[in-house]
Amino acid sequence: KYKDIGFGKVVFEGVSLWTKSALLDVFTRYLLLKKHRKAIRNRDLAVRKMVSLYGEKGVMMADSFIAMDEESIKHISHDCAFVDLPNLTPEEQKSCVFFYGSKEFDLIAAKKVLPQKYPQAKFHIWQGYGHCRKITENPRAYSMILRNEIFSSNC
């Protein structure tokens, strides 16, 4: 579809692979809007929850979430439920790396979609981790993992 865009290596962390999932859209929209309204009412609680999940970056993440407008949240929910997966050649697939935490919801779709749609892509599960928790636990170690992936031989 976008063959004018080229890449050497692409690393996806916890990316949604849900397609045409109206029920997921309704559920996530409801849940995110409810959490957003609660965060607006009680910033301190939102910050505590985010810090408990993501460490010191949680303050910035909570403030960013609070600052979002509801229309943006609805768009995020929709985009996560209706992903338009491109067709990739086997060579393009070999340049893709998909990372998921074993405790994250998007792993359900990844386990179904990746072997069928992108069988040549690398697929790794971080055992014991939730969504994007591997990144925030130790950013320096994670950056080394990314560096190793980017400079690996199948690029």
Which role fits each region the language model picked out?
Residues 4-37:
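Flexible "cap/lid" loop of the alpha/beta hydrolase fold
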Residues 15, 101-102, 128:
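Cofactor-binding loop segments of dinucleotide-utilizing enzymes, especially the Rossmann-like FAD-
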Residues 2, 88-93, 116-118:
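Short, conserved loop/helix-junction motifs that constitute active-site signature segments
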Residues 91-92, 98-100:
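Short beta-strand/loop motif that positions the catalytic acidic residue
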Residues 121-155:
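Catalytic active-site module of serine/aspartate enzymes centered on a nucleophile-bearing elbow/loop
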Residues 104-111:
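Conserved alpha/beta-hydrolase "acid-adjacent" motif
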Residues 38-90:
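Conserved alpha/beta-hydrolase catalytic His-Asp/Glu region
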Residues 10, 98, 123-125:
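Conserved beta-strand scaffold positions in the cores of enzyme catalytic domains, especially
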